[in-house]
Every structure is written in structure tokens, then in C-alpha cells.
A protein has these predicted regions:
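Short aromatic-glycine-enriched beta-strand elements
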Residues: 18-33, 87
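Short coil/loop residues immediately preceding or within conserved phosphate-binding loops
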Residues: 6, 12, 26, 43-45
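Residues on conserved beta-strands of the protein kinase catalytic domain
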Residues: 25, 42-44, 85-89
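Acidic, gly/ser/pro-rich intrinsically disordered tails
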Residues: 1-3, 17-22, 39-41, 84, ...
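Beta-rich strand-turn-strand
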Residues: 51-86, 102
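Short coil/turn motifs at secondary-structure junctions
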Residues: 14-16, 34-38, 53, 77-79, ...
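OB-fold and OB-like beta-barrel modules that bind single-stranded nucleic acids
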Residues: 5-13, 31, 64-75, 93-96
């Protein structure tokens, strides 16, 4: 069976590296994936789980708002809490491409004469 998905979105929060009791590093993040249908925007919030080196790089190089492309597989878990049933879908990342950084509100001073610097 084939279980493959590719998701593009922005990180909802800054990734936080965690370690399992067995010593394996992981990061659990959510990405915001925007869709447009009939001129209406809708945002899906997709949970992503990354392990080991992939998790370490994600936490090291990415911040909230960073656009990433996640290539992985879907993991579906069904849970019951009280009398309600829940289905949780998570993308288990196999590869993550770090794309454009978050939109910055920083402004930079314009240098009119570069010779003044040297």
C-alpha cells in the first residue's frame, strides 16, 4: 500500500526539540496550510512529527512563521474520551525542505554612501 503525502505550510510555533526516554530526539509541530476554493480562504492546521536528525535540524534552523515543505506519511489514531470519539491525523515527516523565512517586521537603515563604512 502507498501512504505518501506532501504538505506546504507555515510553522504555527517555533519547534521545540524533545527527547524520548530512550534518548531519541523528536519535534511535534503544527503547520498552517492555506487553501482557496471559490474565492474563499480556508486554513487547515496539520500536525507534523519529525524524528532524530530531521527533528534536530527543524528546531535549529526554523522559527514560527517559516514556510516548510513536508514529505512524509499519514498516521491515523482513533481515541475515545468520555463518550466522544476522536480521530487524530499526523504527518510523520521523512523529509522537510526549509523554504522562505517568516515575514519580518524588521526595518533596515539605508546606507547612502558605502564608502563611509570603510
Amino acid at each position: 500500500m502507498i501512504n505518501r503525502t506532501i504538505m506546504l505550510g507555515r510553522l504555527v510555533s517555533t519547534p521545540e526539540l524533545k527527547i524520548t526516554q530512550a534518548g531519541t530526539s523528536y519535534v511535534r509541530v503544527t503547520i498552517a496550510n492555506e487553501q482557496v476554493y471559490k474565492d474563499k480562504k480556508h486554513t487547515n492546521f496539520i500536525d507534523v512529527l519529525a524524528w532524530s536528525g530531521l527533528a534536530e535540524n527543524l528546531s535549529k534552523y526554523c522559527d514560527k512563521g517559516r514556510k516548510i515543505l513536508v514529505d512524509g506519511r499519514l498516521e491515523v489514531k482513533k481515541n475515545t474520551k468520555g463518550d466522544k470519539n476522536y480521530t487524530n491525523v499526523t504527518v510523520i515527516a521523512e523529509n522537510i525542505d526549509f523554504l522562505e523565512a517568516a515575514k519580518s517586521s524588521q526595518t533596515f537603515e539605508v546606507i547612502e554612501n558605502a564608502e563611509d563604512i570603510f
